[in-house]
Regions:
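Non-catalytic beta/alpha edge segments that cap or flank active sites
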Residues: 1-158
Length: 158
């Protein structure tokens, strides 16, 4: 989410970082759009993308600036919040910078789609994706109803 990016005044390096990370794990990037920092426009775009995607990743607009409204737009759209995603991102990011506590990023479910807000800087995007990417496949399976039993027996708990 970026006013300047949506007007073509700034290169979207964070969006590129997301696409690069997804390509490295052979995930398909089926859509990409830069949306201005306008709550109704962000919410509409999240709903549109959720119609054909398992996961929607946003970048930017998660701070405390006057135009940072991505979490509010996400909250308008989701039916279930998944606070663990944002908590894990903030926890790991705090190890890098105390400014991580300013993040208002969130995650949740809209229909059968996982929506995750990522920070706006390419470096923070890479750090946060390293935290959440391992949990995304299982989360998507759960959202789709493909997992009937979460606990798999191991030798130690049989």
């Amino acid at each position: 989410m970026s006013d300047k990016g949506s007007r073509g005044e700034r290169e979207d390096k964070s969006g590129a970082a997301i696409r690069d990370a997804l390509r490295q794990i052979q995930a398909a990037v089926c859509d990409y759009k830069i949306v201005p920092d306008e709550r109704p426009m962000i919410a509409a775009e999240l709903r549109r993308m959720a119609k054909h995607a398992d996961v929607v990743l946003t970048t930017g607009g998660t701070g405390v600036g006057p135009r940072d409204v991505t979490p509010e737009a996400t909250r308008d759209v989701i039916e279930k919040e998944l606070p663990g995603f944002a908590e894990a991102m903030r926890m790991e990011s705090y190890k890098v910078t105390p400014r991580a506590i300013i993040s208002r990023a969130m995650a949740g479910i809209h229909g059968k789609t996982l929506i995750v807000n990522l920070p706006g800087s390419p470096k923070a995007v890479a750090e946060c994706l390293a935290v959440v990417l391992p949990a995304i496949p299982h989360t998507v399976e759960l959202i789709r109803g493909e997992v009937v039993e979460c606990a798999r027996p191991t030798e130690s708990n049989q």
